[in-house]
Amino acid sequence: MLASSKRMNSSSRSQILLRWKSDKAQSGPYNVEKEILTSRFLRDTETCRQNFRNFPYPDLAGPRKALSQLRELCLKWLRPEIHSKEQILELLVLEQFLTILPGEVRTWVKSQYPESSEEAVTLVEDLTQILEEEAPQNSTLSQDTPEEDPRGKHAFQTGWLNDLVTKESMTFKDVAVDITQEDWELMRPVQKELYKTVTLQNYWNMVSLGLTVYRPTVIPILEEPWMVIKEILEGPSPEWETKAQACTPVEDMSKLTKEETHTIKLEDSYDYDDRLERRGKGGFWKIHTDERGFSLKSVLSQEYDPTEECLSKYDIYRNNFEKHSNLIVQFDTQLDNKTSVYNEGRATFNHVSYGIVHRKILPGEKPYKCNVCGKKFRKYPSLLKHQSTHAKEKSYECEECGKEFRHISSLIAHQRMHTGEKPYECHQCGKAFSQRAHLTIHQRIHTGEKPYKCDDCGKDFSQRAHLTIHQRTHTGEKPYKCLECGKTFSHSSSLINHQRVHTGEKPYICNECGKTFSQSTHLLQHQKIHTGKKPYKCNECWKVFSQSTYLIRHQRIHSGEKCYKCNECGKAFAHSSTLIQHQTTHTGEKSYICNICGKAFSQSANLTQHHRTHTGEKPYKCSVCGKAFSQSVHLTQHQRIHNGEKPFKCNICGKAYRQGANLTQHQRIHTGEKPYKCNECGKAFIYSSSLNQHQRTHTGERPYKCNECDKDFSQRTCLIQHQRIHTGEKPYACRICGKTFTQSTNLIQHQRVHTGAKHRN
């Protein structure tokens, strides 16, 4: 219990408990308004659902027609034209979950407007936790508790939901919202209007759960009050369960008005064991209810007092009517027969919100008006649906920062940002989260579950957001636009990263060397240089990499996949960066310029490498011999000298090489290809370096100079070999006798002494 109490702070707990208790009390105008505002199932949605759920089999129409009608009803309810498959599935699961909840819990959970089944589960769990914590307190405060339950306190902690289930056999009367006359007078107009809607919503909720076996009289009264008048005129309807009875005549009202009409209040009482009574020709109608709160029974069923004047009697009734309801119906007292036509000229149907509705609605007419914003509607269900938008206004405020939320569950999740509370822990790795939804997403890493599938390419994703982002690759949608340069992006994160190009912001700092980066991913990649961590391993050759992108690129060597194709020449490449580099050969674009010497490059990486020739920076160091390099690829190539790795193998002769470029050059020996041609003499070469060296014979250029003796060379390799004279370095050692040499050619000649091979002239 101590562990569970840490999961939720006292503020969240008190808010949920207060709401739970106030919802159960159902007393006072505040509770009535909350009951109405938090009603989830509106009449129009429930009507579509009930039409589908309760569709009877038409014997005369036949099975094919029945199936067609059933399909049409289902489409009206689920609306697949605006809902995805996942949303429809979530709707069905949420509906069934709310259905199986105990009555009081279901009412409270619905009042929180859960948008998903996961959110509904969280609400039930949080409520369960609070009620379990409240149970021991209530038991200690109670002084007149009978004999202690032999099951102990644990009986409530584990069985309170079951106790509610045992009380599930409720009637429409059990969910009625009753208020007193004093409460009614204290309510604001908007509260009174919303109070009326709760009857219809409660009724449809009961029907959806299969708990209502007949349609109470008050339902058609509220849905179509002009039909009630018609029912009064034409006689009782078995469908409404009305019962016509003789009633003791009330004082003759004809004296009260020249037009022989009188007023009847169709009581907005929410007790549903109603009986509609009639006194006969020219008589008065009244609705009897089992009196709860206030009702017409307390107004109209009084004995006639002959000592009171008729006008006084009428004034009493009239005042009571206006106190208790906004629904006043006048109808002609001259009922010569049951089929007499209602006198529209004299009749008025005065409803504060809905205007005149006793007659047929004309085209373009909108008789139903919202008292909150004044918007008008043609249909009553549309008004109910609209009023729910006011009901869903944010009402839960964070005491720390003042932010408001529509759902209390959202407030609870938000407050954990302030407290740092992370109650949801992964049993696999121990990682904790502030929200259950985040834990669910995280657990898919362990299970490998990817429930969201792209309909275009079939690719699966673990998160819906990832699927949405992926689908933009098919649609080409780029909704995020840079205000500086107009460039658009498919991801908001890409836009944020791009904007740092304009601002120069580099918020991510390496704690080891102080280097800054514009993107967090670049910092993470950089930090692996310090740690030497390489968590990504190739299953083919067991080579390890520091980044997942490097592993993906490497795996294309084994698969031979070349998924990036040039639209100009059709050439395919294994890496997107290689394609981008290649495309510059068509455009000739060199947008990256060195600020020191003005040299231009087609790639930013080439510019970065070039800068190091000015700065002398060599950040890549060999851990074996300590030699440093300006480029990571040079370090990788150098390390193969120590480990002897030669991953690039010729498919024709089987010869292996440390570098892919060397293999490419070698394969030209088999093909005879010499792609590099001298423009001066027409001589062709296999290697570009050979062409560069050859061209210096025409130009006389000797760009490589020794710092010791100022001697010039046309080739870098010649300079390196020369510098070993000054340093005395002999890097080439014979593995048999250990003798060292300054040049590799000298080592090769020496090794023939051991092998007996003769040099070929």
Swiss-Prot record:
SMART domains per UniProt: KRAB, SCAN, ZnF_C2H2
InterPro entries the UniProt entry points to: KRAB, KRAB_dom_sf, SCAN_dom, SCAN_sf, Znf_C2H2-type, Znf_C2H2_sf, Znf_C2H2_type
Domain KRAB: residue ranges: 170-238
Domain of life: Eukaryota
Keyword set, alphabetical order: DNA-binding, Metal-binding, Nucleus, Repeat, Transcription, Transcription regulation, Zinc, Zinc-finger
Intracellular or extracellular location(s): Nucleus
Pfam families, sorted: KRAB (PF01352), SCAN (PF02023), zf-C2H2 (PF00096)
Zinc finger (C2H2-type): 368-390, 396-418, 424-446, 452-474, 480-502, 508-530, 536-558, 564-586, 592-614, 620-642, 648-670, 676-698, 704-726, 732-754
Residue span of region Disordered: 134-154
Keyword Zinc-finger: yes
Family: Belongs to the krueppel C2H2-type zinc-finger protein family.
Entries under PANTHER family matching the protein: C2H2-TYPE DOMAIN-CONTAINING PROTEIN (PTHR23234:SF8), ZNF44 PROTEIN (PTHR23234)
Protein name: Zinc finger protein 287
